[in-house]
Each structure stands twice: as structure tokens, then as C-alpha cells.
Amino acid sequence: MVRPNAPDRFNEEKATYVVRGDGEGGDKPDLDRGAEVIRSVVRKLPARPGVYRMLDARGDVLYVGKARALRNRVTSYTQVARLPQRLQRMVAQTRAMEIVTTTSEAEALLLEAQLIKRYRPPYNVLLRDDKSFPFILLRTDHDFPRVQKHRGARRAKGRYYGPFASAGSVARTLNALQKTFLLRSCTDSFFANRSRPCLLYQIRRCSAPCVDRISKEDYAGLVSDAQDFLEGRSTAVQKRLGEAMTRAADAMDFEQAAVLRDRLKALTFIQGSQSVHADGLGDADVFALAAKGGQLCIAGFFIRGGQNWGHRSFFPAHVAGVPETEVMASFLMQFYEGVPPPKLILVDREPDESALLAEALGETAGRKVEISVPQRGNRKRLLDQAVRNAGEELDRRLAESSSQAKLGRELADLFDLENPPQRIEIYDNSHIQGTSALGAMVVAGPEGWMKGAYRKFNIKRAETQPGDDFAMMREVFQRRFARAIEEDPERTKGEWPDLVLIDGGKGQVSAVAAVFSELGIDDLPFVGVAKGPDRNAGRETFYLPDGREFTLPTNNAVLFYIQRLRDEAHRFAIGAHRAKRAKAMGSSPLDEVPGIGPARKKALLMHFGTTRAIKGASLEDLQKAPGVSAAVAQAVYDFYNPGG
């Protein structure tokens, strides 16, 4: 019998119930013990909709599920003989549960998707690629709206178009928008400080509203045409451009006719370049699933306004032993947790609880959402193409996995590892004469780059001398592995590496060896990888902590693989360094003035043009800037004129 070691808690406001075991039996999996923990929860559960979380002895979330009737659903986990092996393993690790009641099953489904995304439990199907999708933002908070790429929260005022499958899809569409509709893409501060047109005007990618080369009314017409194009009314736009070109030619205005011709060609090109055509489909997403060799791929097309905005393939994790209809349902809920659902979702198989899924997605969209398995017509042809894509992408993935597995075995042989490494961490430093210094860590596994695990380390300790690569490496490793020891001392979360590669030679290896000795880590393999004297790839020398060093033949497959790993670390480090340097260069003395935030800083810069002009302004001039109060003006004036 389980005796809770702390009082059971029930918070009526949050409708959350938690029960914990008494700690007997330790952390070792125990099926009977886990089932008893669940029974102790069931006795107090309501027959209401809600979400449940299975927790292990450390309090980590093992699984998140939803239920129409919590008592009935959770009871099923106590009948362990009927559970598949995957769920038996989960129950054996369960030492506590958390329950959240909801007002409806649809609400429970939405909450389940949020919690899966937050906790990423090991027994849930997981959408690996949860990076936010790019959108096109048409900003409307200016007299002359601008177009730009956007990711993340929708805080800016304007119209959002998307999702696009990739940054490349957005770039191509933005390029077409600039060529066809001549909309500006510059920042407001750049716009406000122009005295002559920029290069984009010269190459016919902008109408130069910054210097009054187009009226506000005519620019509004361009914006309206761009909106029509993005919302699928491109035929009407083509017709208007064609008619305008004809009128210009009839009026002998051949220069204007040529401009309109080029705009029409740009619009026609972007339409003709689409490999997937979805005439008459409006807004829809198309998903198809392929399974083979223990892996699974879901291919998706994104259609908006009848136009293909790209495709992407997904490889969900933790799918072994999970029915494909359940995988599809879980995928859709997680995918749309961060992306607005369209009116129509086409799938190659009906997901579990399809009607409930459509209801939940409809609640997030504020309108009806249809989930359909088409059997004929254009929709079926489009779905068949997605099915082919899913199969081809999965075959490619399996071939890469086979090659990757072979490389893993050879890597284990080369560095005398017990098993092929499941997690490889690669480290590099980046700085320019000690400025904007940082360390970077990239991670690779059997299935490729683990970009969600990448980390950058801003060098910030006073004792780390700028430009001292060895000291930088010491700081990076001290911070990385001191935290690992604190957060995962038993190494059970899969966040400890099986192999560490360091971009550097003897000095870097010695620095890392000293850190590991200080932290009491004596079982973690690490290797230094240094290029030859001329820095050419192919002449790398490998340095081991015991002092040995060796090279590999230039045509060795493992050498090529290690070069790719090191180059990815270098790419990530350089990119992070450039971003840090750009941020530092973008800082201003105004950042140090009390009461000056981004909005007032922007207002002052737009009004005066430069920080030098702000510094030389009188108190009266400062007070004339929009949005700047007398108190703020006084603070700015006092900052630049400390003696009065």
C-alpha cells in the first residue's frame, strides 16, 4: 500500500491534484509499485475531462495524456497486463501523478499539446522540429507600410501571411513582392533619414516613398495589390498590371510600360515556379505519413490563397509501437499549438478522434476547421504528391541513418569507445582580439544535428583574459559540466556526451583535462582536432588527453565526418559572435539614461537623426521630440551635460 510522504494537494482554482508515493523502492522501475501509485490517484479522481501527467521519482514528466473522463482513463493504466510494453515501462517508472481538470475534452486536448511541447516527455510522440515557422509581415503602423520576414510572437501591428515552410520560401516570396509591387523593406529609422533613393530603387525593387518618388495614395494601391496577391487573388492583380501596361504602351510611355512588364513577369515567374499547384483550394495544409524500418516521416505542404508556400518533412520521435493514426493526431495537435490552423487540413489517414481534433483546432482558430481524407479530384492528387514526398524523404533518411550508424561504429573504434556515440558535443571559441568573445557548443547524434541542444557561452568571468583561448575553453567547460553535474548527476537524461571534440590542439586539450580533473570527471572521452600549419582541411592532427597524437588519411570517411562536425561548430560560433558584435555596435549611450527604453530611444533617434545631434540639443529642443516628456528630456539633457 502506498502511503504519501506529503499531504495530497488539491487546488480548486487550478483544479490540480497531485499524489506522491512514499519513496520506498527507490528510483528503480517497479511495475507493481507504479500501478499502486496510479490506483491511489484513481480513488480521488472525478469523472470529468482533463489532463494527467505521469512523474518519475525525480519529478520529471514521463507522459502527458488527456481524457474525456479522467477516472476511467487513468484506471486503464492499473490493468498492466493489457498495456503494451511501452506503457508498462512508463507505469513501472511512475511515482506520482498530476491532474488538471478542464471544462471540455477539446480544452483538455489543447492543454495536452501545450504541456507536451513544454515538457517533451519520453513516452509521448514528439514533434522534433518545433522551430517557429516564418511568416511575411505587412506592417501597417506607418503611412508607407513595409514588408518583412517575421518569426516568433505577433506583437507588431500588421497583417501576417503564412506559415511558410522555410526561410527560403519566405525569401523567394519577398523577392517577388519587391519586384512586383515595389514595397519598401527598410526600417523606419532608415526610411526617416533618407535624402536620396537607395540601391533598391535603382534596381527596381522599391518605389522610394522615403524621398517622395511615389504618392501616399499610389503606394496604398501597391499595398492593396500585394495583399490581393498574398491572399490568393493573383489573377486580378495580373489583369490590372496587364491593362496598365497596355495603357502605358498606347500612350507611348514605353519606359513605364517596361516597368509594368517586368513587374508582371516577376509575378508570373513566382506562380510558374511552384512545384505544387493547388488551384481553387484556398487555405489548406496537406499531410501524409510514411513508415519503414522503425522510423516515420510526415510530409507537409502549406497552401495559402491557392498558392504553395513550401513543403517540409517531419520525423516525430518516440513512435515505436504507437499506432500511425495516433501519431498523426499527436503530430497535428503539436504542430498547430504554435501555428494558426487553416480552414482545411488534408491527411492521408484519419487521425484518432478526428472530430474532437477538428473541434479543438476550431477553438484556437475562432472558426470551423475541417479535417478530410480526400478520395478523388485535385485534393487527392495533391495528397498523393505528399505521400510520394513522405516516402522519398523517409528512404533518404534511412539511407543517411545507415551511413551514420557505420560512421558511429568507426568513430567508436578510432577513439576506443565502448559503443557508437549517441551524443557528440563539439566546442569552438570565437572573438576578434578578445572582443565579443564567446564559446559555442554544437551537438550531433545518430540522426544528425541536434540543433535544439546547441549552446553559446558568453565569456564573462573577470579572470578570463580577453583573447586567451585556453582560459576561454576552461570557462566554457567549467560552466557546461558543473551545471550537468548539478542537474543530472546520474546521467539519466541523455544530456551528457559520449564523446567531446574540441577545435584546438594540445593547449585546449590540457585546459579541458584540468577542468575535468577539478570536477572529478574521469570517464568522458575528449579529443582535440587541430588543422595543419596552413589551416587546410585534410591535414588535421588529433590530440588525446594522454599525450598521444595522430593523423588520418585524407580520404578517410571518419575524417570527413569529423571535419563536418568541426565546421558546424565553427559556423555556429562565428554566427553567434557576429550577432553579439552587431548587438554591441547597435548599442547607444542613450541605453544608460534612466527612464529611456526602446520606444523613447527610437523616438529621439528618429527626431534628431543621430546620437551626436541629441547630445548637442538644448533642453527645449529635446522637449519637442514626440513622446518625450519634460522629465525625460531633463534626464537626457543632464546625462549629456552633467555640469549643467
From Swiss-Prot:
SUPFAM superfamilies: C-terminal UvrC-binding domain of UvrB (SSF46600), GIY-YIG endonuclease (SSF82771), RuvA domain 2-like (SSF47781)
GIY-YIG domain boundaries: 47-125
UniProt keyword terms in alphabetical order: Cytoplasm, DNA damage, DNA excision, DNA repair, Excision nuclease, SOS response
InterPro entries: GIY-YIG_endonuc (IPR000305), GIY-YIG_endonuc_sf (IPR035901), GIY-YIG_UvrC_Cho (IPR047296), Hlx-hairpin-Hlx_DNA-bd_motif (IPR003583), RuvA_2-like (IPR010994), UVR_dom (IPR001943), UVR_dom_sf (IPR036876), UvrABC_protein_C (IPR050066)
Example GO biological process: SOS response
Gene Ontology terms: cellular component: cytoplasm; excinuclease repair complex
Coiled coil region boundaries: none
Ranges of residues in domain UVR: 235-270
Disulfide bonds: none
Family matches, as PANTHER family: UVRABC SYSTEM PROTEIN C, UVRC/OXIDOREDUCTASE
Assembly mode: Interacts with UvrB in an incision complex.
Function: The UvrABC repair system catalyzes the recognition and processing of DNA lesions. UvrC both incises the 5' and 3' sides of the lesion. The N-terminal half is responsible for the 3' incision and the C-terminal half is responsible for the 5' incision.
Family: Belongs to the UvrC family.
Full protein name: UvrABC system protein C
Lineage of producing organism: Bacteria, Pseudomonadati, Pseudomonadota, Alphaproteobacteria, Sphingomonadales
